[in-house]
Amino acid sequence: MKTLFILSLLLNTELFHNSKKGIKFYKKGDYKTAINLFIEEMKNKKKFKNYFYLGQSYSMVNDNQNAIKMYEKALSGKFSKSIIYFEMGLSYFLLEKSEEALQNLNLALKYDPNNVNYLINRGSIKYDLGLINSACMDWMNAKSIDINSIDLELININCN
């Protein structure tokens, strides 16, 4: 029994180490190594935080299909829903699926309605979809929250 406990402790320590290493490589910009470490860890133990970081890593190597799959899995955990929806929206946008991107940005703003970055990006997606007035409203809302958040020239050129 003691041997089983020690073996279990060693295995869990290695998994924790892979997770920490995965985040370390993610932060250093070595996304391919981070992906491999997160996948290795998740073979044995599913952690929703790792799904998020795995999604981020996939997104950074332009594998947005897999990024979306990982973000969807991350939603089941306790990780911040707003950031997951935001990142998933960006991945959809990069796949040229603007309507799905907009749906996700709407959800991100439901959880964090005054997030300037979300408003600016949702405005850009709306603009891409031809929803000019609505895009301009998002940009103006962002500006009202933080005057320095958006280039006023962008608003003047696109909204007047």
Predicted segments — roles?
Residues 43-44, 77, 111, 145:
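Structural marker of alpha-solenoid helical repeat scaffolds
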Residues 133-160:
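Terminal, low-structured helical/coil segments at or just beyond the last alpha-helical repeat
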